[in-house]
C-alpha cells in the first residue's frame, strides 16, 4: 500500500467507531419502537454490543405477507437510489444468499487444484448447494425484509421509518 492510500485509510479508520455507533443507535431505536407489533419477529442478536447495526431484519409469518409489506413500505418511500440495495425481501439479496453463489453451487475451486472441493476431507461430499438445500434458511429468506441502516440517519429519518412501518402494519391488521 502506498503512502497516500495508507494515510487515507488511517483517517477513515478513526471515523469507524462513530460510524458504527450511529448505525447501532439508529437500528436499536427503530427496533425498540417496532417491538410493540406482534406480527414482526426480530432476528435474535447473539452479541448486541458487537452488532454494528448495519441492518434491521424483520421477519413475518409467511412469504406473501412479507412481499405485501415490503411493497407497501417501498410505496411509503422507504427506498434508496437506484444503485442502492435496501428495503428488500432477502431472496433479492443476490450473492449473499448461498444458492446465488456460482462458485458454491458449481463447486468451483479457488485455485488450480480446485480447492476446497478437491481436499481429501471433501472427496465423498455429495452436498448440493442449489435452492432448497437449506429449507429453514430458505424459509427465513422468503419471510424476512432487510433494511440497511446508514450511519447518517437523522432523528427525522428514523421517525419516518417507524411511521412507515406503523402505517403499513396497521393497514394489515395487528
Pin down the residues of each PLM region:
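PLP-dependent aminotransferase class I/II
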Residues: 1-174
Amino acid at each position: 500500500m502506498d503512502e497516500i492510500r495508507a494515510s487515507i485509510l488511517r483517517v477513515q479508520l478513526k471515523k469507524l467507531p462513530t460510524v458504527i455507533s450511529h448505525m447501532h443507535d439508529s437500528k436499536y431505536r427503530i427496533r425498540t419502537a417496532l417491538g410493540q407489533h406482534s406480527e414482526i419477529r426480530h432476528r435474535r442478536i447473539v452479541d448486541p454490543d458487537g452488532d454494528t447495526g448495519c441492518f434491521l431484519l424483520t421477519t413475518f409469518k409467511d412469504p406473501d405477507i412479507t412481499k405485501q409489506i415490503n411493497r407497501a413500505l417501498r410505496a411509503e418511500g422507504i427506498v434508496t437510489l437506484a444503485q442502492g440495495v435496501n428495503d428488500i425481501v432477502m431472496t433479492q439479496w443476490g450473492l449473499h444468499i448461498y444458492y446465488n453463489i456460482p462458485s458454491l453451487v458449481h463447486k468451483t475451486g479457488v485455485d488450480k487444484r480446485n480447492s476446497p472441493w478437491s481436499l481429501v476431507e471433501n472427496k465423498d461430499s455429495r452436498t448440493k448447494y442449489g435452492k432448497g438445500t437449506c429449507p429453514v434458511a430458505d424459509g427465513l429468506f422468503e419471510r424476512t425484509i432487510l433494511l440497511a441502516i446508514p450511519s447518517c440517519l437523522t432523528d427525522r429519518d428514523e421517525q419516518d421509518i417507524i411511521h412507515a412501518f406503523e402505517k403499513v402494519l396497521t393497514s394489515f391488521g395487528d
